[in-house]
């Protein structure tokens, strides 16, 4: 569970105010399969298997990633439909997504706290993407008039008919090894050919596996 203020890498950036994963995870020779921005939180899958890392982050495979997004304002049906249909972001249309309003998930307050304006209400969205362009979630919500205040990735769908890998049970900064069953599922990805779950558009949508 990557906390706020931590880069999705194990080496610090010189002069950066952000921390790095090595401050939280004492496991050598693993790397993030898909990044989260330093000001985002949530699920990172770490692996030493380069093929698995590539497989999970290749946008051509279209692994759904689920985010909880606290936004400024209250989403209306038209805004949700625009998020789902796809938006022009930096000259390129995003792939169709899944978007819905959700109740406050009751997360612990972020440290540092989000910046709220007393006169503007906030609300939560569940947003699922199959691609991961740079700061895509934030750009998408801003494009429909709902600036992002807080962003967490909560699940990654392995597209194998089983439940997605989930952040459940992990506090910020905590990590765990995958279970034997999860390990088998991940290895199964490397044996599967494109088909089940479908490809998401030939991989022309830019960097994969991020979005946050």
Residue locations for each model-derived region?
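RNA pseudouridine synthases
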Residues: 1-195
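Intrinsically disordered, low-complexity arginine-rich tails of RNA-binding/processing proteins
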Residues: 195-212
